[in-house]
Structure formats: structure tokens, C-alpha cells
Amino acid sequence: MAETKVIYHLDEEETPYLVKVPVPANEIRLRDFKAALGRGHAKYFFKAMDQDFGVVKEEISDDNAKLPCFNGRVVSWLVSSETSQTDSAPPAAEVRPDPPPVPPPVPPPPAERTSGIGDSRPPSFHPNVSGSTEQLDQDNESVISMRRDRVRRRDSTEQGVARGVNGRAERHLSGYESSSTLLTSEIETSICDSEEDDAMSRFSSSTEQSSASRLLKRHRRRRKQRPPRLERTSSFSSVTDSTMSLNIITVTLNMEKYNFLGISIVGQSNERGDGGIYIGSIMKGGAVAADGRIEPGDMLLQVNDINFENMSNDDAVRVLRDIVHKPGPIILTVAKCWDPSPQGYFTLPRNEPIQPIDPAAWVSHSAALSGSFPVYPGSASMSSMTSSTSVTETELSHALPPVSLFSLSVHTDLASVAKVMASPESGLEVRDRMWLKITIPNAFLGSDMVDWLYHHVEGFQDRREARKFASNLLKAGLIRHTVNKITFSEQCYYIFGDLTGCENYMANLSLNDNDGSSGASDQDTLAPLPLPGASPWPLLPTFSYQYPAPHPYSTQPPAYHELSSYSYGMGSAGSQHSEGSRSSGSNRSDGGRGTQKDERSGVVGVGGGESKSGSGSESEYSTRSSIRRIGGGEAGPPSERSTSSRPPLHHPPSVHSYAAPGVPLSYNPMMLMMMPPPPLPPPGACPPSSSVPPGAPPLVRDLASVPPELTASRQSFHMAMGNPSEFFVDVM
């Protein structure tokens, strides 16, 4: 004879019951189910399908109504009438109805539900709650929440039916499995609805006295069903007060499938005692690696039922070793670490060099911040760096407009994109990598860089264009392969190139590409070096720092015709010229000659020596030195203005001095414009001559009297004066 299986849930019990009714599934009615069950005074809900809402719980009270059947089975929920009447109003004293008779095939309810633990009502329903707050601990509440877990997931689809099942509205959990979320949602829907109460109920499993006292002050209110919020899905079901701020998980490992646990532990200790044991590394093939939830850096709190909180490291290791050797599953309770590899919370940038302090740049930068003179964004030398130091990243960040992560596009230069990408807060995963047992520090994967470019740089049509952009970064030397491969691959590790000098690309510009093999290398060079032992700035006074330093600069640069009449005199800085293979690391000065062959922009050196460029050694490019005028009203014959045979003159401290005594200044057209006009020579002064007798001191010459063979220098100086916001350099 055909029979139908009926699965029914009784009240709030976790385990469902099964009864077989000797009636075919398509003909079974409510009276057949009642006859087989032998229970009265109950409400019957059945799983049904609604066209609008899908699966619902439908209440059927007509004995002749057919029961909905799914896959040959009927699913039902029974709510005793006594339970619903008891929950409708708070009783004066706790009344527990006698359990109804249970059919023979149904097992008895669990024994843990006695002595008040299984009571589903909040503490506010108990009249003697003040005397029973000690029983309201987190273990009891965790048991309650876990036993209601499965029933609540089934009872949350329909508001009205759910209210009939357990006496109050339930919340739909949207599939979250956390038991603490279940406990939190139960208290929220039955007690409170405000944000303040939500915060209270969120920690109800660990605040025992406070939760009980707050519940006493509130009346039970029925609330409408509302969707849950995602932020309430944290899981600390039985968190103690000492570890409530940590994310604690419990992992059960089946040791029958794996031969070993597969972890190495690290102990932490200091002068105050042991600080616990942590997961050092995880080995492949072990039980922990197969589970995947435990990571290096997690703190081991408990193994099986043995707590490590008040145990020394040696004892904890011994206990762990003994448990591993025993058969059976192993339960590990660990506290998750916050972040095993922080990307830049309190770490210094990797490419931040330690630079020497330049007081001159400090003073000029302070003046720029105070607004004393305008900062031209196009001039990378506004920081008045000396020729002995290069332009650093810190000063460039003040002189150049910053490039942020949100302003990158395909039109941004490669150096700026690489610099933003190399910053610790860029989001690119840069860390130490292992390749062929070789540690590559601060490396990143090619595919990660392509993804970063595609998501952070605007203008790419597809990912292929971002990959082409990454290939250009490799060709430009801004990123480098470990073995210096020139073709880009997304499966390779890369490191950042030298980004410190990427802003000095103007130094690579050249007006004349000379290779140094012809006589052209003797033309268009700097003024000669000073005599050995002589100060390169004999007329400059001692620098005195004044804070804030006054800068009587004009905001508008003077016209070039005014500058063309200036005389720039007395002083040159030794510099090294390099042009690819040609270098001048060994500058030599022939001090016995008086002719000045090398003149630049009307500038004559102090000494009578001629500077020549050596050959054969590599040297770096050095910046040009700007020239100071003679201050203090020096008006006389040129012979009186020479200083080769007399000590330096002493003048009051000048506010225009940007470098320490004896240190040459960097070549900057803006420095020339910042100086006031020099005094005009008296009418009796002799005009400067282009030829100087041997042994005589050099003369100051006007710009117009420069020989025509120095055309490149004159044109460069004209362009620099006509475009004061740009920086023109002749690379020798």
C-alpha cells in the first residue's frame, strides 16, 4: 500500500520528526495527518508554493484540505496552542507546559533543554531575573542560539507565519551561518529597534550584567520584519571579555585523512613573561593547509579542551605535541591576526632616500610657503640647490605639481605613473618574492601591474593597451626584470627602477651633440676653474641666515633688453662635463696661461687658467653655476675690480646669498632675474677688452662683446632669458 512521508517540526525543537501516513501522496488530507499524529490543539503549517512569493508556509485548518506535496513528501510545522497562548502575554510566574505525548518513532528531546536553558524567552520575562543573572552567561546564550539556528533559517520566509510559529516576528538571515548573528537578530526584533539598542544587543553574548539590566528597562514590542544589515555578521559566539576585540575561529581538523598537522609555531616572550605561541608557517600537504582558514601570524589559543591562555610556551608546545600524537580529530582555536602583510600603515616608503640638509633650500622653501615670491612650476631648480647635490624627491614634490592617484591618464608621463605606482599606498602588491630559491625584495607580478594600470589609469580601451603601457615602462627603465629581460611578460616578477632621477630628464637635452673627438669639444664650455687654494667666490660675503629671510624679488621678470646690459662678473664654479662616452672627471687647470679661450654667456673666470676636459673616465653631469655681481658700489677701472692679487672684500650680509661660502651655486636663469641692476660704471671707465695680457686679471665683459663662435651659448642664454620659467642646459 502506498504511503506518504510527513516531516514535521514541533515548536522550536531543532530536530524534525518523521511520520508515515498510509495514504498516497496525491490524496493525503489534513485529517489523515492528524489521525496519524494523534495530537490536538495545534496549528498546522505546510510548505507550499505561491506564484508571487515562491516557497511559503501555509496554514491549513480544514480537515478535508489536501496537503501540498514536494518530491513525494509533506513538510509541516506544528505550533502548540498552549505555546502561542503562553507567549501572547508575560505570565506572573514562569509556567512551563507539560510536554505533549510523543509518538513512538519520535526520539525524546535532548536532555540539555532542562533547567531553563531551553527557554526561548528573553530574561525580561522572568520575574526573578535579578537573582538569576549569573546563569545568563555567554555559554548558555550560545547554546540557545545554536539550537535555534536551523529552525530560524526555515521560519524566516513569511512574517505572519513566522510570528505564529514561535510567538514573535523572526528576521530573515539571508544565509548567514553565524550563531551570534542569530542571537543578535532575535533580541533586536523582539526588544529594540534603535541604533543604540542595536549596539547593546550586538555584544549581548559577552556583557552579562549590562544586558540583563537593560532588558529589564524595556518593554517587549513586536516589530515588523526588516532586512538584515551586512555589518552584523561577525562571529564571536562565545567570546570572553579578555579576547572580545579579536576575531576568534575554531577549526576542527580530521587527522584520519592527513599524516601530519603541518604547522610550525613561534613563541613570544619578554621580561614580563611568555606572550603566547603563534603560527609561524604552514606546510603544504598538512591538515591545516588543506583547511585553509588558519594563516601565519594567527595566535593559538586552545587545542581541543586545553586553554593556552595562562600557560607558558614550553608547556603549550608540550601539550600540542602530545595531542598531535594521539588519534582522533584536533580542534584548534586561534585568534586571527589583523593583517599578516600591511601595505603601508606605519611603514616608511621604500624609495625615500636620506638626504643631507641644505640650509639654502630650507630658507627658499620657507619663503615659498610664506608666499614671498611666486614658485614657477616649470623650474626644477627653484629650490636653489648647490652643484654638489642633486635635486631630491622632497624638493621636487614642492616645486612640481603633485600627481595623485586620481589624476593618472594615458597622457601622463611614464615617470609620474611609475612614481605613483611605487608609493606604498598605491594598492599594488609589492613584497619580497621567491623565485628559484632566490629572494627578490620589493617585487611585484607583471599581471598585477597590468591590472593596476587598467584600473587606475584612465584612457585604456581594454587590458591589452594597459599591457602595452607596462611594456613601455619596462623599455624606459622605470621597471626592471630580475634578469634584465627586455620583453614584458605578465608571469614574471619585476622591481622598480631608479625613480629618484626620473625628473631630471631635462638634463639629457642637448643643443649640440658633440662626441668629443673633434675640435668642437673645446668650444662652448664653462669658464675656467679657480686657482688651487683660492676661494671660488672671493667677493661673496659670509652667509647669514635670517628667519624668515626677506626676498625683495619682483613678481614680474624684467625684460631681456634690461638684462643684456648687466655685467656678471668675478667667479666661476668648477664643473665636470660629460656627454655619453666623453667625460671630464679629471679636470686640469693650466695656471700659467693668461688667455681666456672658454667663455660662457659673457662670463669670465677668476683665475687665469684654462679648463680642459680630460678623456677616458666616466663622470656625471653637473649643473651650471650662476654668477654674482660685485656689490657695494665698486665703480672704477677694471683693474681695480680684479681680485687675483688681493684679499676678498668684506660686505654686509647679503640676502641674495643662497649657498654657504665656497660652494658654487646651480645655474638658474631665475637667480639672475632676482638680483637688482648693478651700478653703472663711471664715464671714465675703460671699456672691456677681449684680449688680456698674460698674467693680468680677467675683465668683466658685456654680453654683446661675446665672440661669434660662442653662438650656441648666446642662443641658449637668450632663450633662457626669454623663457624664465624653463630651464635650458647645454650638455657638453
From Swiss-Prot:
GO biological process terms held by the UniProt record: activation of GTPase activity; anterior/posterior axis specification; canonical Wnt signaling pathway; ciliary basal body organization; cilium assembly; convergent extension; convergent extension involved in gastrulation; dorsal/ventral axis specification
This protein's UniProt keywords: Cell membrane, Cell projection, Cilium, Cilium biogenesis/degradation, Cytoplasm, Cytoplasmic vesicle, Developmental protein, Gastrulation, Membrane, Nucleus, Phosphoprotein, Wnt signaling pathway
Subcellular location: Cytoplasm; Cytoplasmic vesicle; Cell projection, Cilium; Nucleus
A GO CC annotation given for this chain: plasma membrane
Main location (coarse class): cytoplasm
Domain called PDZ: residue spans: 250-335
Biased composition (Low complexity): 570-589, 612-629, 637-647
InterPro entries tied to this protein: DEP_dom, Dishevelled_C-dom, Dishevelled_fam, Dishevelled_protein_dom, DIX, DIX_dom_sf, Dsh/Dvl-rel, DVL2
UniProt feature, compositional bias: Basic and acidic residues: 146-157
Residue ranges of domain DIX in the record: 1-82
UniProt free text on domains: The C-terminal region containing the DEP domain is required for membrane accumulation and phosphorylation. Wnt signaling and axis induction requires the DIX domain. The C-terminus contributes to the localization at the cilia base.
Similarity remark: Belongs to the DSH family.
Subunit structure as annotated in this protein's UniProt entry: Can form homomultimers. Interacts with prickle1. Interacts (via the PDZ domain) with ccdc88c/dal and dact1-B/dpr. Interacts (via the DIX domain) with ARP/Axin-related protein and dact1-A/frodo. Interacts with sdc4, possibly via fz7. Interacts directly (via the DEP domain) with efnb1/ephrin-B1. May interact indirectly with the phosphorylated ephrin receptors ephb1 and ephb2 via SH domain-containing adapters.
Function: Involved in at least 2 independent signaling cascades, controlling cell fate via canonical Wnt signaling and cell polarity via a planar cell polarity (PCP) cascade. Acts synergistically with dal/dapple-like to activate Wnt signaling, stabilizing ctnnb1/beta-catenin and leading to dorsal axis formation. Also prevents degradation of ctnnb1/beta-catenin by displacing gsk3 from a complex with ARP/Axin-related protein.
Protein name as it appears in the record: Segment polarity protein dishevelled homolog DVL-2
Source organism: Xenopus tropicalis (Western clawed frog)
